[in-house]
Every structure is written in C-alpha cells, then in structure tokens.
Curated annotation (Swiss-Prot):
Subunit text: Interacts with hair keratins.
Protein name: Keratin-associated protein 5-4
Tissue specificity note: Expressed during the active phases of the hair cycle in the medulla and the inner root sheath of the forming hair. Also expressed in the upper layers of the epidermis of skin.
Native organism: Mus musculus (Mouse)
Sequence repeats: 21-24, 27-30, 79-82, 89-92, 107-110, 117-120, 135-138, 145-148, 155-158, 173-176, 183-186, 193-196, 203-206, 213-216
Domain of life: Eukaryota
Keywords, comma-separated and alphabetical: Keratin, Repeat
Length: 223
C-alpha cells in the first residue's frame, strides 16, 4: 500500500507521505498515482484516488472518478454532470460546434446539436419558419421532425405550402402539405361543396358552383 506514490506506510496520520504528496489528508488507497494529477489537489480521498489525466481540469473537481478522468477540459461551472462534455455527461450546456440557436440553457440533452440531441430548438440549416420555439421534435426541419411551423414534404399539419390558391392555403385546409391533387380536405372554392379541395380538372367530387351540377370538373355547371 502506497501513499499517492510516496513510499512508506499508511498510518492514521499518512505515515511518511512527503510534502509533494497529500500530507494533510491521508491518501492511502490501493491504487493511487497522483503524478497524473500533478499532485493530490483537494484531497485524493474525495475522488478515491486521482484517475486518468486530471491535469486537463486542473485537478480533480467534484470527484473525477465518476467519469474516469476529466475529458476535453470541460470541468467548468454547471456545464458538466460527472466531469466531461461528451456522451451523456452534460445537461444544461452544449459542447462547441453547435449553432448559436441550440447551444444554450436547457436546449440539449446529451451534448450535441445533431440527430436527436436537441429538444426545443433546431440546428442550423432549417428554414426561418421552422427553427423556432417548439417547432421541431428531434432536431431538423425535414421528414416528420416539425409539427406546427414548416411547409415542406410531409412535415406540416395545419398550414399549406406556397403556390396554392388563397381559398385553400389556410388554417386546417390541408392534410399533408400542399394544395394539389388530393392534398386538401375540408376547404372549397365556395361554400362546403368540394371534397378534395380545388377548382380544377378532376379536383371536386359532388360539389358545384350552384346546386349539384359538378361531378369531375369543378365550377362549371352541366346543362
């Protein structure tokens, strides 16, 4: 049994540890090599012996043993939980390389701004209409990421994409996200006559511009 690399017994008063080791605090543990820490700082007992390159943190802070040594020099403020900024270490703040819109407050879960890391805000590269507040679910503005605020592919629910007629692209007019073919459901060119929702070619079913005159073609009456 050694005392932080110092030869000698491990008595109740640290029994022979030199000034370069942990003299005030007895640091006698089965395996303890404080050379990697540049000396025991704050008492090796608090972290069960210095482990794996604590120098990057400037000594063990809060117990490096929980993460097997500090990594990447991220032992600061309330950034880390155990003692690093990788994998699932961080909670409130993100590592570098994330967009300014994401790496803040309680934005991230693990520690990044990609894949399924972020919750409320989106990563860069999304349209201005999507990457805001509670717009996205995982962290993008494509596929099925966004809920209320985007107009692409199958992202949107309530709003329509551009290029639709003013009578269609509103409120809960569309289902997938367009005003063509069989995209729209409830809205019509006039009252509530159309089923799919547009007044072109084979758009309408039973609706009519007057009574029940239209079948395949909309807004033209059969005589």
């Amino acid at each position: 049994m050694t005392c932080c690399g110092c030869s000698g017994g491990c008595g109740s008063s640290c029994g022979g540890c030199g000034s370069s080791c942990c003299k005030p605090v007895c640091c006698c543990v089965p395996v303890c090599s404080c050379s990697s820490c540049g000396g025991c700082k704050g008492g090796c007992g608090s972290c069960g012996g210095c482990k794996g390159g604590c120098g990057s943190c400037g000594g063990c802070k809060g117990g490096c043993g929980s993460c097997g040594g500090c990594k990447g020099g991220c032992c600061q403020s309330s950034c880390c939980k155990p003692c690093c900024c990788q994998s699932s270490c961080c909670k409130p703040c993100c590592s570098s390389g994330c967009g300014s819109s994401c790496c803040q407050s309680s934005c991230c879960k693990p520690c990044c701004c990609q894949s399924s890391c972020c919750k409320p805000c989106c990563s860069s590269g999304c349209g201005s209409s999507c990457c805001q507040s509670s717009c996205c679910k995982p962290c993008c503005c494509q596929s099925s990421c966004c809920k209320p605020c985007c107009c692409q592919s199958s992202c949107c629910k309530p709003c329509c994409s551009s290029g639709c007629g003013s009578s269609c692209c509103q409120s809960s007019c569309c289902k997938p996200c367009c005003c063509q073919s069989s995209c729209c459901k409830p809205c019509c060119c006039q009252s509530s006559c159309c089923k799919p929702c547009c007044c072109q070619s084979s758009c309408c079913k039973p609706c009519c511009c007057q009574s029940s005159c239209c079948a395949p073609v909309c807004c033209q009456c059969k005589i």
